[in-house]
Amino acid sequence: MKTTAEIRQSFLDFFHSKGHQVVESSSLVPENDPTLLFTNAGMNQFKDVFLGMDKRPYSRATTAQRCVRPGGKHNDLENVGYTARHHTFFEMLGNFSFGDYFKQDAINFAWEYLTSPQWLGLPKEKLWVTVYETDDEAYNIWNKDVGVPAERIIRIGDNKGSPYASDNFWAMGDTGPCGPCTEIFYDHGDHIWGGPPGSPEEDGDRYIEIWNVVFMQFNRLADGTMEKLPRPSVDTGMGLERISAVLQHVNSNYEIDIFKTLIAKTAEIVGATDLTNKSLRVIADHIRSCAYLIADGVIPSNEGRGYVLRRIIRRAVRHGHLLGAKESFFYKLVPTLIDVMAEAGKDVKAKQTNVEKLLRLEEEQFARTLERGLSLLDEALSQVKDGILSGEVAFKLYDTYGFPLDLTADVCRERNITIDEQAFDRKMEAQRTRAQAASQFGVDYNSVIRVDGETKFEGYTEVESQAKITALFYDGKSVESIEAGQSAVVILENTPFYAESGGQIGDSGYLSTQSVTFNVKDTQKYGQVFGHIGELTQGSLKVGQSVNAIVDAKRRHNTSLNHSATHLLHAALRQILGLHVVQKGSLVSDKALRFDFAQPEAITKEQLSEIETLVNQKIRANFPVQTDIMDIDSAKAKGAMALFGEKYGDKVRVLTMGDFSIELCGGIHAKRTGDIGLFKIITENAVAAGIRRIEAVTGQNAIDWLHNQQRILTQSADLLKSDVNTLAEKIQQLQDKAKKVEKELQGLKEKAAMQAGSYFVKSAVKINGVSVIAQQLDGIETKSLRVMVDDLKNQLGSGVIAFASILDEKVNLVVGVTNDLTAKIKAGELVNLMAQQVGGKGGGRPDMAMAGGSQLENVTQAIKVAQDWLNKNL
């Protein structure tokens, strides 16, 4: 019986024997594709090839692509672990033809791999196929050439409500490449319920789709017209877990070798004995998606990809809690995962320390609120009468206790209760603090400038070139000429201008002739051409005309210093903080550099000083900045670091600075590190959960920054009648003095508050025999109000006190209740009622509670509401 690892390798070996290039799985974070949250299919990394925007040195490829499909807007995730084939993470085996072979070979390859005794050797009589209803070519290949009997070939038409909307017709989008597909199904046998595709029983588990072969032969236009593609292509996908289940003679993916091992290890760690428990399946699935997402650079956070990761981790933690886990357990599965994934586990192994650390930190963070949140949910569920949990409760769990909605849905599912998701959505919309992941992703590929050909870049060695204009764009439209005063995009045949990429800003400068001046404000890349964005200030320009292209050399030079310093900073961070540090974003301009990186913990001042010192040491070492062009595999073998989110071709540019830094980079750099002169960090802070940002300056900008700091220090010392050397000591003396005065003032306020107590006791009103004081006292801080309330409780013996005070444009509320009344009157309940009137919230003990608010105009109303509520409840 083949293991999953052996099946993966045999697939790649088979297609390699058929002339396919074996291509590594791409990252789960799609490169240069804002339309996708995660890589979810094998074709994602080849999307630009299919669109004609990218060229590869091969026309046949095969991959074992890791994919993540975490579910839809809310609670699709709750099904993972409860069905036989629903996963957050899976591997997609695929073979691809880019204008090479088409239907005949694609179908023959699939059949040979599945049925040949040399490969998988599946019984031919167990295989069924579907084709698009009008795809006679595919039908005839299956029937006449391959020999599949007609009764096992099913034509599927438009079954989704509109033309070409079918299970057997695939499209990349509303427009663009599309075409029919043929799917191969495996019949598990009549001991399992279900019918063949297209039948009323097709949702059963007997007939399972194992391979989808897409024939991209049309280009769909905006009006729905289908044009034949000049070079049709093939895109296929076969789920590794599904074919493993077939070959290992099991009906559920969770029974294949990978999952059996992960489930057994989970049970061992948490002390579970029932290996059929659904929670074990959930955890075994989730460790795969979570570990690989972190290895590919995703950090748990409250938005976008990071929030999807957080949802999955928290669901796994909750299921561990159900199994009886008493301590952090999830991260302990990583070594087992690496082992069972075999060759495909190498990316997680390379980041193992960071993966385990982030999983443990996230689990520990959630554990602090898990118990309280579950207690609140349990109480709310016990009061449900109509089988529906209110959206308000679900939102409170989300907002206060960090419960993703699908986690709450998981708990509800176990009690046959649903959630009022519409009410939840209304609360989310009102809050507007956490964006839905899907709202952050989406781009219309047809809206960008599209030009055939490519621009030859000469900027590595030149800052001035003669160049011919190949296209002009005015107001987003292609034009033949532009006139003075018009802003436009100029496309050149060759250029010294660097187009923005890799974090480095685009060059500026000008294009000119004797009678023409076009000021270039920015340079951007559109496919393979460079667009020079700016304004024509003199003369006219037309397509075909030659111009002098002249880069702003000083701006370029300063930018190059900052770019080289960014590489030194990256290497220094990894040396001092650890190899888990990976770039998450950067901006390199002529003024400064900004570098975002993965780092789960705050950086100490000492570490920051070490980092800065190390970078400056490497600057003084005056390493040559060496550039080499090589293939991607050689670069990786040399130890070159590929950056998160960047897209590389087969030939890459490797930038080396001594033995300290080696990275893939297409940017402009200094000739030697000594050219940078000086490196100074000016800010360091967190920009998101697990992501830190450093901003720094170099060269003359660093010197100017230090001069400005010195000027500020000198002015500050003069104001305090001190000198720079004793300034810190002088400030400390002033702070100590201020604290002493503040303490004395607070004592006087508290004394005055206690003396005022007798007045309030006399002004107390009786409600059903209970003394009540409800007053507005402006200008008094919360601490003094609390002292006053405590004193009044002692003086009254029995009573309720509610104070509101306006101070520094804020409302402070304090409520006190004597112990004999807390069974009837809760201070927290009353203070929250008052807080609602002033746009705030608060809480506390039954006998003492505080709140704040911002709506000063409603303070009188808050006091009145308190009086009315006490009249009603006493």
Swiss-Prot record:
Chief site of localization: cytoplasm
Pfam families xref list: DHHA1, tRNA-synt_2c, tRNA_SAD
Enzyme class: ligase
Cofactor(s) this protein requires: Zn(2+)
Alphabetical keyword list: Aminoacyl-tRNA synthetase, ATP-binding, Cytoplasm, Ligase, Metal-binding, Nucleotide-binding, Protein biosynthesis, RNA-binding, tRNA-binding, Zinc
A single cellular component GO annotation: cytosol
InterPro entries: aa-tRNA-synth_II/BPL/LPL, Ala-tRNA-lgiase_IIc, Ala-tRNA-ligase_IIc_anticod-bd, Ala-tRNA-synth_IIc_core, Ala-tRNA-synth_IIc_N, Ala-tRNA_ligase, Ala_tRNA_ligase_euk/bac, DHHA1_dom
Cofactor: how bound: Binds 1 zinc ion per subunit.
Compartments it resides in: Cytoplasm
GO terms (BP aspect): alanyl-tRNA aminoacylation; negative regulation of DNA-templated transcription
Reactions performed catalytically: tRNA(Ala) + L-alanine + ATP = L-alanyl-tRNA(Ala) + AMP + diphosphate
Known role: Catalyzes the attachment of alanine to tRNA(Ala) in a two-step reaction: alanine is first activated by ATP to form Ala-AMP and then transferred to the acceptor end of tRNA(Ala). Also edits incorrectly charged Ser-tRNA(Ala) and Gly-tRNA(Ala) via its editing domain.
HAMAP family listed in its UniProt record: Ala_tRNA_synth_B
Annotated domain remarks: Consists of three domains; the N-terminal catalytic domain, the editing domain and the C-terminal C-Ala domain. The editing domain removes incorrectly charged amino acids, while the C-Ala domain, along with tRNA(Ala), serves as a bridge to cooperatively bring together the editing and aminoacylation centers thus stimulating deacylation of misacylated tRNAs.
Protein name as catalogued: Alanine--tRNA ligase
Origin species: Haemophilus influenzae (strain ATCC 51907 / DSM 11121 / KW20 / Rd)
